[in-house]
Design a protein with these regions (language model features):
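Short low-complexity stretches enriched in small and charged residues
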Residues: 105-112, 257-268, 370-375
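Conserved small-residue
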Residues: 180, 186, 197-287, 318, ...
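Glycine-rich, aromatic-lined ligand/substrate-binding cores of catalytic
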Residues: 286-321
């Protein structure tokens, strides 16, 4: 709506050429074997005179045995299938400009004249190769009591070789990151889904489901030197999401307090301010939660129906820039002692000489105290566990008698709410799902907007 309007134009084009083959075998309709092979050529990894390969050949094999078709398992077991498989997956860079610099024009950059510039903030890498993921998986599909109860369990073990990521680059380079193949990341875990039909009559039905996943990750290798790889950092620059050999994926590696052997924070003798650990960072947590939980239930009574879905994660941590700023500026509830700021407060910990803290921090010094803690990443680390009502719906199926004489065969009206509220949330003042980067840099939050709560009306008509 402004008088002078500007515009921009960008052009992206990428292509994957593939050769694919598969074969399927069956034995007496209860044993099945499938094998595949595929070769992909990625345009995003292709460059004239490039020595590193731009393609990858990967295969897979899966075997399933429907034991309930060849064994008498009694009346209790309705269906039983065992499955196992090995698979490989390959991929290229997302951007078609990952291998070379791209240039653009910045309008009215100097005295009204256009200026040329380098587009993008990532240093290209001509030696990037396709990443590869290898996985072994075993599972069981069990259904019981005339399919009223089903259990689907899976164990997996995989490794990702040469993942294509943007690692942190020195600010003096003029770029924010550099493209690289990350060494070797392993993941193993279990997935469990249980479904049950609890009750069913002509007028009433009640179904429920529970799902659980747990993943164990490890950084097996990073680069040729085995050094740490930094992925991202908050604007406070006192912490980095770092891949460290032998540790779990996505370590929050940052500044911390000096502590005594008992774990108490050590404070300066002169003014009682906590002492930061100089010259060394440590692992303060891990941004990727290893465990996910879910519960769903649906009900039907005559023409009315309702459903609820509850989801949550546990075991992860998050660096909250929002809370770091609230503490620094005195807006966090922890900066207000029970007796008020005027009465001062006594920090938890010990003095440099090992003695207990007996004097309080007066109001005039409290600002200095909390401004010091802002520079220490450990202060803003929180557990990111949560459980929330992801979706709740209530619906009504309009009886066919009410639709007689109309052009509508079936009508359903539903009221649906998503992300309604938390049942539990271990973070202060933020939504743990509002981390500003959920990719290779999960675990960082910086004034992130919460996941929106939405309530809507859905009308479904069939003609």
């Amino acid at each position: 709506n402004t008088k002078n309007q500007g515009g921009g134009y960008s052009y992206w084009k990428k292509k994957i050429n593939s050769a694919y083959g598969s074969a399927e075998f069956g034995f007496q309709d209860w044993a099945f074997l499938t094998v595949t092979a595929r070769n992909d050529w990625f345009s995003t990894l292709s460059l004239k005179d490039k020595k590193a390969p731009n393609n990858d050949l990967y295969t897979s094999a899966s075997l399933s045995l429907v034991l309930s078709d060849v064994m008498d398992l009694g009346d209790t077991v309705s269906f039983l299938k065992l499955r196992g498989g090995y698979s490989q997956v390959a991929g290229g860079a997302d951007s078609p400009y990952a291998l070379s610099l791209a240039y653009g024009i910045y309008g009215q950059g100097h005295l009204g004249a256009s200026l040329g510039n380098i587009s993008g903030g990532t240093i290209p890498n001509t030696e990037i190769t396709p990443f590869e993921k290898n996985e072994i998986e075993f599972g069981v599909d069990l259904r019981m009591f005339d399919n009223k109860l089903s259990i689907d369990a899976t164990y997996y073990d995989n490794e990702t070789l040469g993942d294509i990521v943007g690692v942190s680059a020195s600010a003096t380079s003029g770029f924010g990151s550099a493209l690289a193949n990350l060494g070797n990341i392993s993941n193993s875990g279990i997935e469990l889904l249980i479904k049950g039909e609890i009750m069913r009559t002509d007028d009433f039905a009640w179904n429920a489901s529970i799902n659980y996943t747990n993943n164990t990750s490890e950084v097996v290798a990073t680069n040729d030197t085995g050094g740490n790889i930094s992925m991202d950092e908050p604007r406070s620059r006192n912490l980095r999401v770092t891949h460290i050999v032998g540790e779990k994926y996505g370590a929050l590696y940052g500044s911390s307090y000096v502590r005594n052997d008992a774990g108490a924070i050590v404070h300066e003798m002169v003014n009682g301010i906590p002492i930061p650990k100089i010259g060394a960072r440590k692992i303060l947590g891990f941004g990727v939660a290893p465990t996910s939980l879910g519960f769903g239930s649906s009900f039907r009574y005559k023409d009315f129906n309702a459903s609820i879905l509850v989801e949550g994660k546990t075991g992860g941590q998050i660096y909250s820039g929002t809370n770091a700023f609230l503490i620094r500026n005195g807006h966090h509830k922890k900066t207000v002692p029970a007796g008020g700021r005027e009465a001062g407060f006594t920090p938890s910990g010990v003095m440099e000489d090992g003695s207990s803290i007996t004097t309080s921090i007066p109001q005039a010094q409290q600002e200095d105290y909390y401004r010091r803690t802002y520079s220490i990443a450990e202060e803003a680390i929180q557990d990111s566990d949560y459980m929330r009502v992801r979706q709740l719906s209530i619906g009504y199926n309009v009886p066919s008698s009410m639709l007689e004489g109309t052009f509508v065969d079936k009508a359903t009206v539903s009221l649906i709410g998503r992300n309604l509220f938390f049942l539990s949330n271990s973070t202060d003042n933020i939504d743990p799902e509002s981390a500003y980067n959920n990719g290779n840099s999960a675990g960082l939050e910086w004034f992130g907007l919460p996941v929106p709560r939405t309530i809507g009306l859905n009308v479904n008509l069939k003609f």
